Protein backbone atom coordinates (compact mmCIF):
# COMPACT_ATOMS: atom_id res chain seq x y z
CA UNK A 1 0.00 0.00 0.00
CA UNK A 2 1.18 3.53 -0.81
CA UNK A 3 2.54 5.75 1.95
CA UNK A 4 0.19 8.54 3.02
CA UNK A 5 1.19 11.99 1.80
CA UNK A 6 -1.20 13.68 4.26
CA UNK A 7 -1.90 11.83 7.51
CA UNK A 8 -2.94 14.79 9.69
CA UNK A 9 -6.52 13.45 10.00
CA UNK A 10 -5.26 10.14 11.44
CA UNK A 11 -2.74 11.93 13.67
CA UNK A 12 -5.38 14.30 15.05
CA UNK A 13 -7.69 11.38 15.89
CA UNK A 14 -4.85 9.88 17.95
CA UNK A 15 -4.17 13.29 19.59
CA UNK A 16 -0.73 13.50 17.97
CA UNK A 17 0.86 16.77 16.79
CA UNK A 18 -0.30 18.27 13.47
CA UNK A 19 0.64 21.46 11.60
CA UNK A 20 -2.96 22.63 11.08
CA UNK A 21 -6.36 21.30 12.20
CA UNK A 22 -7.55 18.69 9.68
CA UNK A 23 -10.98 19.13 8.13
CA UNK A 24 -13.53 17.09 6.19
CA UNK A 25 -17.31 17.36 5.86
CA UNK A 26 -19.99 14.80 6.54
CA UNK A 27 -21.76 14.14 3.21
CA UNK A 28 -18.90 15.91 1.40
CA UNK A 29 -19.68 13.74 -1.63
CA UNK A 30 -23.24 14.83 -2.27
CA UNK A 31 -26.00 16.78 -3.89
CA UNK A 32 -24.57 20.26 -3.26
CA UNK A 33 -21.99 19.47 -6.00
CA UNK A 34 -23.18 19.72 -9.63
CA UNK A 35 -20.68 17.01 -10.64
CA UNK A 36 -22.26 14.64 -8.09
CA UNK A 37 -25.71 15.24 -9.59
CA UNK A 38 -24.33 14.44 -13.05
CA UNK A 39 -22.74 11.17 -11.86
CA UNK A 40 -25.88 10.16 -9.97
CA UNK A 41 -27.96 10.78 -13.12
CA UNK A 42 -25.53 8.56 -15.02
CA UNK A 43 -25.99 5.79 -12.40
CA UNK A 44 -29.80 6.00 -12.60
CA UNK A 45 -30.55 5.99 -8.87
CA UNK A 46 -28.87 6.22 -5.49
CA UNK A 47 -28.34 2.50 -4.78
CA UNK A 48 -27.06 1.88 -8.33
CA UNK A 49 -24.49 4.58 -7.61
CA UNK A 50 -23.49 2.87 -4.33
CA UNK A 51 -23.22 -0.53 -6.05
CA UNK A 52 -21.03 0.61 -8.96
CA UNK A 53 -17.44 0.70 -7.61
CA UNK A 54 -16.14 3.03 -10.35
CA UNK A 55 -18.96 5.56 -9.91
CA UNK A 56 -18.85 5.34 -6.08
CA UNK A 57 -15.12 6.04 -6.38
CA UNK A 58 -15.75 8.99 -8.71
CA UNK A 59 -18.19 10.69 -6.30
CA UNK A 60 -15.90 9.99 -3.32
CA UNK A 61 -13.06 11.82 -5.10
CA UNK A 62 -15.11 14.76 -6.45
CA UNK A 63 -14.95 16.95 -3.31
CA UNK A 64 -11.18 16.33 -3.04
CA UNK A 65 -10.68 17.87 -6.48
CA UNK A 66 -12.42 21.05 -5.32
CA UNK A 67 -11.22 21.41 -1.74
CA UNK A 68 -8.03 20.70 0.27
CA UNK A 69 -9.85 18.15 2.46
CA UNK A 70 -7.79 15.99 4.81
CA UNK A 71 -9.80 12.79 4.37
CA UNK A 72 -12.03 11.00 1.90
CA UNK A 73 -15.10 9.12 3.12
CA UNK A 74 -16.47 6.06 1.38
CA UNK A 75 -19.55 6.89 -0.66
CA UNK A 76 -22.22 4.49 0.59
CA UNK A 77 -25.30 4.45 2.81
CA UNK A 78 -25.86 3.38 6.42
CA UNK A 79 -28.72 1.10 5.29
CA UNK A 80 -26.54 -1.31 3.29
CA UNK A 81 -26.57 -3.83 6.19
CA UNK A 82 -30.38 -4.10 6.57
CA UNK A 83 -30.63 -4.25 2.77
CA UNK A 84 -28.15 -7.16 2.77
CA UNK A 85 -30.27 -8.86 5.47
CA UNK A 86 -33.08 -9.06 2.91
CA UNK A 87 -35.38 -6.23 4.05
CA UNK A 88 -35.66 -4.80 0.54
CA UNK A 89 -34.41 -1.22 0.70
CA UNK A 90 -35.97 1.27 -1.69
CA UNK A 91 -36.22 5.06 -1.85
CA UNK A 92 -39.57 6.83 -2.01
CA UNK A 93 -39.47 10.24 -3.72
CA UNK A 94 -39.69 12.89 -1.00
CA UNK A 95 -40.00 10.21 1.70
CA UNK A 96 -36.45 8.90 1.96
CA UNK A 97 -35.54 5.25 2.61
CA UNK A 98 -38.22 2.55 3.05
CA UNK A 99 -38.18 -1.24 3.47
CA UNK A 100 -40.44 -3.70 1.68
CA UNK A 101 -40.16 -6.15 4.63
CA UNK A 102 -39.74 -4.29 7.95
CA UNK A 103 -39.19 -6.17 11.22
CA UNK A 104 -42.55 -6.74 12.91
CA UNK A 105 -42.07 -9.78 15.20
CA UNK A 106 -39.64 -11.80 17.30
CA UNK A 107 -39.65 -14.46 14.57
CA UNK A 108 -38.51 -11.85 12.03
CA UNK A 109 -35.51 -11.08 14.22
CA UNK A 110 -34.68 -14.75 14.81
CA UNK A 111 -34.73 -15.36 11.05
CA UNK A 112 -32.52 -12.38 10.15
CA UNK A 113 -29.28 -13.53 8.56
CA UNK A 114 -25.94 -11.90 9.40
CA UNK A 115 -24.63 -10.82 5.99
CA UNK A 116 -21.20 -11.87 4.75
CA UNK A 117 -19.42 -8.58 3.99
CA UNK A 118 -17.47 -10.10 1.09
CA UNK A 119 -20.61 -11.62 -0.46
CA UNK A 120 -23.85 -9.66 0.04
CA UNK A 121 -21.86 -6.49 0.77
CA UNK A 122 -19.02 -7.24 -1.62
CA UNK A 123 -19.91 -4.17 -3.69
CA UNK A 124 -18.95 -1.97 -0.71
CA UNK A 125 -15.56 -3.69 -0.37
CA UNK A 126 -14.98 -3.31 -4.13
CA UNK A 127 -15.69 0.41 -3.76
CA UNK A 128 -13.24 0.68 -0.81
CA UNK A 129 -10.49 -1.07 -2.79
CA UNK A 130 -11.14 1.06 -5.89
CA UNK A 131 -11.11 4.31 -3.90
CA UNK A 132 -7.90 3.41 -2.04
CA UNK A 133 -6.18 2.65 -5.34
CA UNK A 134 -7.33 5.93 -6.91
CA UNK A 135 -6.50 8.04 -3.85
CA UNK A 136 -2.87 6.96 -4.35
CA UNK A 137 -1.99 7.93 -0.78
CA UNK A 138 -3.15 11.56 -1.05
CA UNK A 139 -5.36 11.42 2.07
CA UNK A 140 -6.76 8.62 4.26
CA UNK A 141 -10.05 6.87 3.51
CA UNK A 142 -12.77 6.69 6.17
CA UNK A 143 -15.08 3.68 6.27
CA UNK A 144 -18.34 3.80 8.18
CA UNK A 145 -21.50 2.12 9.37
CA UNK A 146 -24.72 3.10 11.07
CA UNK A 147 -25.01 2.19 14.76
CA UNK A 148 -27.15 -0.83 15.72
CA UNK A 149 -29.80 1.42 17.34
CA UNK A 150 -30.00 3.72 14.31
CA UNK A 151 -30.20 0.79 11.87
CA UNK A 152 -32.88 -0.83 14.06
CA UNK A 153 -35.02 2.34 13.97
CA UNK A 154 -35.25 2.14 10.17
CA UNK A 155 -35.79 -1.64 10.17
CA UNK A 156 -38.60 -1.60 12.75
CA UNK A 157 -40.24 1.68 11.68
CA UNK A 158 -40.04 0.60 8.03
CA UNK A 159 -38.18 3.79 7.13
CA UNK A 160 -37.55 7.26 8.53
CA UNK A 161 -39.45 8.35 11.62
CA UNK A 162 -39.98 11.48 13.70
CA UNK A 163 -41.44 10.04 16.91
CA UNK A 164 -39.99 6.46 16.87
CA UNK A 165 -43.21 5.08 18.37
CA UNK A 166 -42.96 1.65 16.71
CA UNK A 167 -39.43 0.88 17.88
CA UNK A 168 -40.10 2.39 21.31
CA UNK A 169 -43.13 0.13 21.63
CA UNK A 170 -40.78 -2.81 20.98
CA UNK A 171 -38.21 -1.34 23.40
CA UNK A 172 -40.66 -1.11 26.29
CA UNK A 173 -43.06 -3.99 25.51
CA UNK A 174 -40.63 -6.53 23.99
CA UNK A 175 -37.12 -5.53 25.12
CA UNK A 176 -35.74 -9.05 24.58
CA UNK A 177 -36.71 -8.90 20.90
CA UNK A 178 -35.02 -5.53 20.47
CA UNK A 179 -31.87 -6.69 22.30
CA UNK A 180 -31.66 -9.72 20.00
CA UNK A 181 -31.98 -7.45 16.96
CA UNK A 182 -29.35 -5.01 18.27
CA UNK A 183 -26.99 -7.87 19.09
CA UNK A 184 -27.28 -9.27 15.55
CA UNK A 185 -26.74 -5.79 14.14
CA UNK A 186 -23.66 -5.25 16.32
CA UNK A 187 -22.19 -8.55 15.07
CA UNK A 188 -22.98 -7.53 11.49
CA UNK A 189 -21.39 -4.09 11.92
CA UNK A 190 -18.21 -5.62 13.39
CA UNK A 191 -17.86 -7.94 10.38
CA UNK A 192 -18.71 -5.11 7.97
CA UNK A 193 -16.26 -2.56 9.39
CA UNK A 194 -13.46 -5.10 9.77
CA UNK A 195 -13.97 -6.05 6.11
CA UNK A 196 -13.78 -2.35 5.16
CA UNK A 197 -10.52 -2.07 7.14
CA UNK A 198 -9.06 -5.13 5.39
CA UNK A 199 -10.16 -3.66 2.04
CA UNK A 200 -8.28 -0.44 2.82
CA UNK A 201 -10.29 1.89 5.10
CA UNK A 202 -7.73 3.67 7.31
CA UNK A 203 -10.22 4.93 9.92
CA UNK A 204 -13.84 4.05 10.68
CA UNK A 205 -16.81 5.94 12.03
CA UNK A 206 -20.08 4.74 13.58
CA UNK A 207 -23.03 7.06 12.91
CA UNK A 208 -25.64 6.94 15.67
CA UNK A 209 -27.99 9.40 14.02
CA UNK A 210 -30.99 8.67 16.25
CA UNK A 211 -29.39 7.95 19.65
CA UNK A 212 -30.51 11.42 20.75
CA UNK A 213 -34.15 10.25 20.65
CA UNK A 214 -33.51 8.16 23.80
CA UNK A 215 -33.48 8.96 27.51
CA UNK A 216 -30.08 8.68 29.21
CA UNK A 217 -30.86 5.27 30.67
CA UNK A 218 -32.24 3.89 27.40
CA UNK A 219 -29.35 5.36 25.42
CA UNK A 220 -26.87 3.42 27.55
CA UNK A 221 -28.90 0.19 27.36
CA UNK A 222 -30.04 0.21 23.73
CA UNK A 223 -27.45 2.27 21.86
CA UNK A 224 -24.15 2.80 23.66
CA UNK A 225 -23.88 -0.78 24.92
CA UNK A 226 -23.87 -2.04 21.32
CA UNK A 227 -21.44 0.61 20.07
CA UNK A 228 -19.14 -0.47 22.91
CA UNK A 229 -19.41 -4.05 21.67
CA UNK A 230 -18.45 -2.85 18.17
CA UNK A 231 -15.41 -0.91 19.43
CA UNK A 232 -14.29 -4.04 21.32
CA UNK A 233 -14.66 -6.16 18.17
CA UNK A 234 -12.85 -3.93 15.67
CA UNK A 235 -9.46 -4.58 14.13
CA UNK A 236 -7.53 -1.56 15.42
CA UNK A 237 -4.28 -2.07 13.46
CA UNK A 238 -3.71 -2.50 9.73
CA UNK A 239 -0.83 -1.79 7.33
CA UNK A 240 1.40 -1.07 10.34
CA UNK A 241 -0.84 1.76 11.60
CA UNK A 242 -3.55 2.21 14.19
CA UNK A 243 -7.04 2.35 12.66
CA UNK A 244 -8.87 5.03 14.69
CA UNK A 245 -12.58 4.70 15.44
CA UNK A 246 -14.94 7.65 15.92
CA UNK A 247 -18.39 7.40 17.53
CA UNK A 248 -20.97 10.05 16.70
CA UNK A 249 -24.35 10.29 18.41
CA UNK A 250 -26.37 13.19 17.05
CA UNK A 251 -27.90 14.91 20.09
CA UNK A 252 -25.55 12.96 22.36
CA UNK A 253 -23.64 15.84 23.96
CA UNK A 254 -24.89 14.99 27.46
CA UNK A 255 -23.34 11.47 27.29
CA UNK A 256 -19.78 12.23 26.17
CA UNK A 257 -18.18 10.78 29.32
CA UNK A 258 -19.96 7.45 28.87
CA UNK A 259 -19.12 7.41 25.15
CA UNK A 260 -15.43 8.07 25.88
CA UNK A 261 -15.38 5.04 28.20
CA UNK A 262 -15.98 2.69 25.24
CA UNK A 263 -12.32 2.85 24.21
CA UNK A 264 -13.00 4.68 20.94
CA UNK A 265 -10.38 7.17 19.71
CA UNK A 266 -12.66 10.12 18.95
CA UNK A 267 -16.17 11.47 19.47
CA UNK A 268 -18.18 13.41 16.92
CA UNK A 269 -20.00 16.47 18.23
CA UNK A 270 -23.07 18.09 16.74
CA UNK A 271 -23.51 21.87 16.86
CA UNK A 272 -25.62 21.79 20.04
CA UNK A 273 -22.50 20.92 22.08
CA UNK A 274 -19.98 23.51 23.18
CA UNK A 275 -16.57 22.25 22.05
CA UNK A 276 -14.71 23.96 24.93
CA UNK A 277 -16.99 22.21 27.42
CA UNK A 278 -16.59 18.89 25.57
CA UNK A 279 -12.80 19.19 25.65
CA UNK A 280 -12.84 19.94 29.40
CA UNK A 281 -14.98 16.86 30.00
CA UNK A 282 -13.35 14.22 27.77
CA UNK A 283 -10.36 15.79 25.99
CA UNK A 284 -7.91 13.77 28.10
CA UNK A 285 -9.41 10.52 26.75
CA UNK A 286 -10.52 11.13 23.15
CA UNK A 287 -10.11 13.44 20.18
CA UNK A 288 -13.12 15.55 19.17
CA UNK A 289 -14.62 16.01 15.73
CA UNK A 290 -16.90 18.90 14.83
CA UNK A 291 -18.89 20.93 15.17
CA UNK A 292 -20.12 23.82 13.02
CA UNK A 293 -23.84 24.02 12.30
CA UNK A 294 -24.14 22.91 8.64
CA UNK A 295 -26.61 25.77 8.06
CA UNK A 296 -23.78 28.24 8.75
CA UNK A 297 -22.64 27.49 5.17
CA UNK A 298 -25.61 29.58 3.95
CA UNK A 299 -23.99 32.64 5.56
CA UNK A 300 -21.64 35.03 3.79
CA UNK A 301 -17.91 34.13 3.73
CA UNK A 302 -16.97 36.57 6.50
CA UNK A 303 -19.55 35.03 8.86
CA UNK A 304 -18.37 31.50 8.01
CA UNK A 305 -14.77 32.50 8.84
CA UNK A 306 -15.94 34.09 12.09
CA UNK A 307 -17.66 30.84 13.11
CA UNK A 308 -14.59 28.75 12.22
CA UNK A 309 -12.44 31.12 14.33
CA UNK A 310 -14.88 30.82 17.24
CA UNK A 311 -14.87 26.98 17.21
CA UNK A 312 -11.06 26.85 16.90
CA UNK A 313 -10.77 29.23 19.88
CA UNK A 314 -13.25 27.08 21.81
CA UNK A 315 -11.11 23.98 21.34
CA UNK A 316 -7.96 25.99 22.01
CA UNK A 317 -4.26 25.15 21.73
CA UNK A 318 -2.94 21.73 20.96
CA UNK A 319 -3.98 18.53 19.29
CA UNK A 320 -6.95 16.22 19.13
CA UNK A 321 -9.40 18.24 17.03
CA UNK A 322 -10.75 17.27 13.61
CA UNK A 323 -12.86 20.10 12.21
CA UNK A 324 -16.17 19.08 10.66
CA UNK A 325 -19.77 20.15 10.45
CA UNK A 326 -22.10 19.03 13.23
CA UNK A 327 -24.01 16.88 10.71
CA UNK A 328 -24.15 16.45 6.92
CA UNK A 329 -23.77 19.38 4.52
CA UNK A 330 -27.13 20.57 3.14
CA UNK A 331 -27.84 19.89 -0.52
CA UNK A 332 -28.50 23.52 -1.50
CA UNK A 333 -25.36 25.09 0.02
CA UNK A 334 -23.25 27.05 -2.52
CA UNK A 335 -20.16 24.89 -3.24
CA UNK A 336 -17.88 27.94 -2.95
CA UNK A 337 -19.03 28.43 0.67
CA UNK A 338 -17.74 24.94 1.49
CA UNK A 339 -14.44 26.07 -0.05
CA UNK A 340 -14.36 29.15 2.21
CA UNK A 341 -14.95 26.86 5.22
CA UNK A 342 -12.14 24.39 4.39
CA UNK A 343 -9.61 27.13 3.58
CA UNK A 344 -10.48 29.05 6.77
CA UNK A 345 -9.95 25.99 8.99
CA UNK A 346 -6.43 25.46 7.66
CA UNK A 347 -5.42 29.13 7.67
CA UNK A 348 -6.90 30.08 11.04
CA UNK A 349 -5.83 26.93 12.91
CA UNK A 350 -2.08 27.20 12.29
CA UNK A 351 -1.37 29.38 15.40
CA UNK A 352 -3.06 26.75 17.62
CA UNK A 353 -0.42 24.19 16.59
CA UNK A 354 2.67 26.41 16.85
From Swiss-Prot:
GO molecular function terms noted in the UniProt entry: uroporphyrinogen decarboxylase activity
The UniProt record lists the keyword Cytoplasm: yes
Pathway: Porphyrin-containing compound metabolism; protoporphyrin-IX biosynthesis; coproporphyrinogen-III from 5-aminolevulinate: step 4/4
Catalytic activity entry: uroporphyrinogen III + 4 H(+) = coproporphyrinogen III + 4 CO2
UniProt record similarity statement: Belongs to the uroporphyrinogen decarboxylase family.
Role played: Catalyzes the decarboxylation of four acetate groups of uroporphyrinogen-III to yield coproporphyrinogen-III.
UniProt protein name: Uroporphyrinogen decarboxylase
Annotated source species: Pectobacterium carotovorum subsp. carotovorum (strain PC1)
Gene: hemE
Amino acid sequence: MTDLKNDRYLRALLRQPVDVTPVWMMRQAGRYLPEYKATRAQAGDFMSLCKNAELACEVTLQPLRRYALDAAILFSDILTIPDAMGLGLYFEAGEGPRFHSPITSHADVVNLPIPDPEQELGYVMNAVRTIRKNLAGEVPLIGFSGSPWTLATYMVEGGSSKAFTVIKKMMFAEPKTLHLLLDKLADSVILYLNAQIRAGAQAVMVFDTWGGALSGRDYKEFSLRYMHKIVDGLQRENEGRRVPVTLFTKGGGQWLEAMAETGCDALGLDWTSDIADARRRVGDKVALQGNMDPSMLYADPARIEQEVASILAGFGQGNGHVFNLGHGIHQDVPPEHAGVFVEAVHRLSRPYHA
